[in-house]
């Protein structure tokens, strides 16, 4: 039996135990995971160092190396995520609503785990921990398929996780990791309907579209982030600058980083030289439309290919627009439905923007970087969904459950 099928069967069998585990048992398992991550910190960081060195040897962009790299702070963040998830309310068993028919039949809608989940992701090893602890807390087993560039890091992390589970009531095989990096396994994995209840791809457009278009297992699509910030004519320009810098430069390789900046034409002459200079101080390559280049001639000319592109790098494209309506139309055309922001002091424009922009998260006077499970108070997230069905935005514990109807009768029969 090959590795994929063997491990898929294991997570399916383990789910029969995990879905009935108590909150105490699940929290104990997550606490043990946090302890093992700390105990085996040196081993994990050494494995990650090897991955990072190999990535740099291959000429991988530094913004993508940043997604791959671990350090003590990021290990601490993983441990903190474990502690946060332990403190979150267990959604399993929650009675969503209930009612009693006239004949006394009692009907309740009760939250239950989805089932074994397959996660296909690329270079971020912290995803291994975040997805695992959320899956366990919500009663779901997990089959992980990480990117080849993070193989050593992921093996070290999963080894620590499985060692932790051995010391708890939760089956060790509740978490399995596919070590074979053959890409053909992705296609096999997303068609394992017999064993997996859901597949979640986390990565770039190519991975997500491949999974969406080829899976027979239901897919929760985590989206590409071509995120925009629109600076309205009424915006406080002094306050706007740090918001834009934060959105673009804090973690440029993440899906909630701003990729496009739209500026109202009435403030363009005043604002563009300031923001371009500040972006460049932070190492950002600035591209711009013709109107932008009339004001700041030395920016790189933006082409049509720029507007739909998620750079995941220190690059931003700027477009001057006539008004909020043109900004909205531009975003409607090029948005991936992830996170969009308006900076404004005009209530009507803010209300219009929020109403007309179709995205998982729409912001008024805030950085797009807040679209994150931890920032939204969900603890760690398993991904950020840009689809409309089942879950949208950061996918936390509740979004990893479904429900069943529990019907209590007194030997009722239907008339």
From Swiss-Prot:
It is found in: Cytoplasm. Keywords: Amino-acid biosynthesis, Cytoplasm, NADP, Oxidoreductase, Proline biosynthesis. Gene3D superfamilies: Aldehyde Dehydrogenase, Chain A, domain 1, Aldehyde Dehydrogenase, Chain A, domain 2. One of its GO terms (cellular component) is cytoplasm. PANTHER family: DELTA-1-PYRROLINE-5-CARBOXYLATE SYNTHASE, GLUTAMATE SEMIALDEHYDE DEHYDROGENASE. InterPro entries: Ald_DH/histidinol_DH, Ald_DH_C, Ald_DH_N, Aldehyde_DH_dom, G-glutamylP_reductase_CS, Glu-5-SA_DH, GPR_dom. Belongs to the gamma-glutamyl phosphate reductase family. Its main location: cytoplasm. It catalyses: L-glutamate 5-semialdehyde + phosphate + NADP(+) = L-glutamyl 5-phosphate + NADPH + H(+). One of its GO terms (molecular function) is NADP binding. The keyword Cytoplasm applies. GO terms for biological process: L-proline biosynthetic process. Its EC number is 1.2.1.41. This is Gamma-glutamyl phosphate reductase.
């Amino acid at each position: 039996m090959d590795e994929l099928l063997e491990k898929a069967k294991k997570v399916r069998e383990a789910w029969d135990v995990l879905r009935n585990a108590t909150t105490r048992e699940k929290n104990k398992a997550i606490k043990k995971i946090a302890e093992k991550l700390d105990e085996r910190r040196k081993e994990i960081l050494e494995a990650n160092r090897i991955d990072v060195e190999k990535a740099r040897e291959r000429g991988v962009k530094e913004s993508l190396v940043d997604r791959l790299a671990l350090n003590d702070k990021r290990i601490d963040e993983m441990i903190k995520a474990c502690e946060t998830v332990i403190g979150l309310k267990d959604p399993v068993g929650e009675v969503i609503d209930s009612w009693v028919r006239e004949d006394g039949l009692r009907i309740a809608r009760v939250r239950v785990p989805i089932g074994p989940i397959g996660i296909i992701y690329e270079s971020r090893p912290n995803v291994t921990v975040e997805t695992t602890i959320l899956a366990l807390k919500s009663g779901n087993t997990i089959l992980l398929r990480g990117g080849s560039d993070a193989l050593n890091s992921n093996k070290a992390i999963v080894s620590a996780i499985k060692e932790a589970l051995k010391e708890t009531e939760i089956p060790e095989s509740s978490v399995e990791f596919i070590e074979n990096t053959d890409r053909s396994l992705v296609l096999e994995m997303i068609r394992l309907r017999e064993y997996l209840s859901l597949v979640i791809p986390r990565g770039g457009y190519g991975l997500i579209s491949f999974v969406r278009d080829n899976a027979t297992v239901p897919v929760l699509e985590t989206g590409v982030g071509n995120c925009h910030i629109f600076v309205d004519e009424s915006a406080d320009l002094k306050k706007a600058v740090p918001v834009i810098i934060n959105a673009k430069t804090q973690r440029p390789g993440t899906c909630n980083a701003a990729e496009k900046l739209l500026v109202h034409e009435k403030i363009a002459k005043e604002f563009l030289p300031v923001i371009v200079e500040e972006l460049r101080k932070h190492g950002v390559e600035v591209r711009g439309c013709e109107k932008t280049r009339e004001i700041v001639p030395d920016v790189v000319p933006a082409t049509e290919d720029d507007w739909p592109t998620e750079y995941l790098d220190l690059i931003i494209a700027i477009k001057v627009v006539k008004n909020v309506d043109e900004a909205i139309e531009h975003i409607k055309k090029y948005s991936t439905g992830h996170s969009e922001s308006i900076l404004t002091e005009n209530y009507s424009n803010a209300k219009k923007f929020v109403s007309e922009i179709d995205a998982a998260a729409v912001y008024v006077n805030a950085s797009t970087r807040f679209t994150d499970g931890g920032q939204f108070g969900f603890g760690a997230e398993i991904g950020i969904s840009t689809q409309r069905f089942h879950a949208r935005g950061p996918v936390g514990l509740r979004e990893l459950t479904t429900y069943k109807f529990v019907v209590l009768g007194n030997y009722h029969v239907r008339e």
